[in-house]
Design a protein with these regions (language model features):
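Bacterial Sec-dependent N-terminal signal peptides
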Residues: 1-25
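Structural motif marking the loop-to-transmembrane transition
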Residues: 2-3, 48, 241
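Low-complexity, Ser/Thr/Pro/Gly-enriched N-terminal "stalk/linker" regions
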Residues: 24-93, 121, 125-126
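Intrinsically disordered or highly flexible coil/loop and linker segments, enriched in small
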Residues: 65-69, 111, 192, 290-293
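Aromatic-lined, polymer-binding surfaces characteristic
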Residues: 91-92, 100-105, 116-277, 286-303
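P-loop NTPase catalytic cores that bind/hydrolyze ATP
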Residues: 97
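Helix-turn/linker elements and helix-coil junctions of extended alpha-helical scaffolds
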Residues: 106-110
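Glycine-rich phosphate/ribose-binding loops and adjacent secondary-structure elements
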Residues: 281
Length: 303
């Protein structure tokens, strides 16, 4: 469990896309590093928790009531969202990406508070309102093709499993059923034949895990297609390009799915994802130069 917690928290911190004010007093520092436990960075489990809290506090600076949404000021005119039609999913993205950090923190401390608000109460309230037509957080059922909403709901499925006792279990059956129906409308809907298939997989695996009837043939088909993208030595072809998403998406989401759901639901696929990750170990250092520099391929350097 400790290894799983550490994997998810590291993934969460690396995935959160928040801007940081680079004032000296606002930069996270590792205090009292322990180089016996962590020879390279000195960061222990507690340091990673502190780093997560540091990032999440930045987000909660914008949250003053349970109704406030994780929607942050834009820095540049060309940044997403580009029009008002994209704002609802941008708000959902803010919820989902910050929950990547909040979920393992809540697993460790369900009573966590930030900016005078109980973090668990905030996220549960926002999750419930995803399927509430009267709420500004409402996300309607899918009516078209694949969209960013699929990705964010898949991300929520990961977090709800990671901190199920805090985020999912306290909901009423009616609330669970309503949220599940919204998620299924996207999870069982069309996708793109790339790492996007993981988000269908996470939605369907989570709801299957909770006892809901899901399209299992579609779930298994997406798993097979994801594994078919493997090209050896740790590399996946991401329909059809090779880039750092091979390490970020496939080699992160694959093992997380295997640990959370796969070993129980589809052990043969879980085993293959883990073997593919092991293949990556010897090749990963070649993504960097001798002085630690890396190629800037799109935005993937952020990850």
């Amino acid at each position: 469990m400790k290894a799983r917690f550490a994997l998810f928290l590291l993934f969460a911190i690396l995935s959160l896309k928040l801007s940081v004010v680079f004032a000296q007093e606002n930069i996270f520092t590792v205090r009292q590093p322990d180089y016996q436990k962590s020879p390279y960075t000195g960061m222990t489990r507690q340091h990673w928790i502190q780093a997560g809290e540091y990032l999440l506090k930045g987000a909660f600076n914008y949250i003053h009531t349970l109704d406030d949404q994780m929607y942050f000021p834009k820095q540049l005119d060309k940044t997403y969202p580009r029009n008002t039609g994209e704002i609802p999913v941008a708000k959902l993205e803010g919820l989902a990406r910050t929950l990547f950090v909040a979920a393992p923190l809540l697993k460790d401390n369900p009573e966590l508070e930030m900016n005078g608000i109980k973090v668990a109460d905030y996220y549960r309230y926002q999750l419930i309102n995803i399927s509430n037509p009267e709420s500004k957080s409402y996300i309607p059922h899918r009516t078209g093709g694949p969209s960013q909403t699929l990705l964010e709901l898949g991300s929520l499925a990961i977090s709800m499993k990671a901190a199920q006792e805090v985020l999912w279990n306290p909901l009423t059956k009616k609330q669970k059923d309503s949220l599940a129906a919204t998620m299924l409308s996207y999870g069982e809907g069309p996708t793109i034949g790339s790492n996007w298939m993981f988000f269908n997989v996470f939605i369907l695996s989570f709801l299957k895990d909770q006892g809901y009837a899901v399209n299992e043939s579609y779930l298994e088909s997406n798993l097979q297609k994801l594994l078919a993208r493997y090209r050896g030595e740790g590399w996946y072809n991401d329909a059809p390009a090779y880039d750092y998403y091979s390490a970020w998406a496939y080699q992160t989401y694959g093992p997380i799915w295997a640990e959370m759901f796969g070993k129980k639901q589809y052990p043969q696929y879980a085993r293959q994802f883990m073997e593919n990750q092991h293949d990556m170990v010897d090749n990963y250092p070649f993504l960097f130069s001798r002085d630690g520099r890396m190629n800037m391929w799109g935005r993937s350097i952020c990850f």
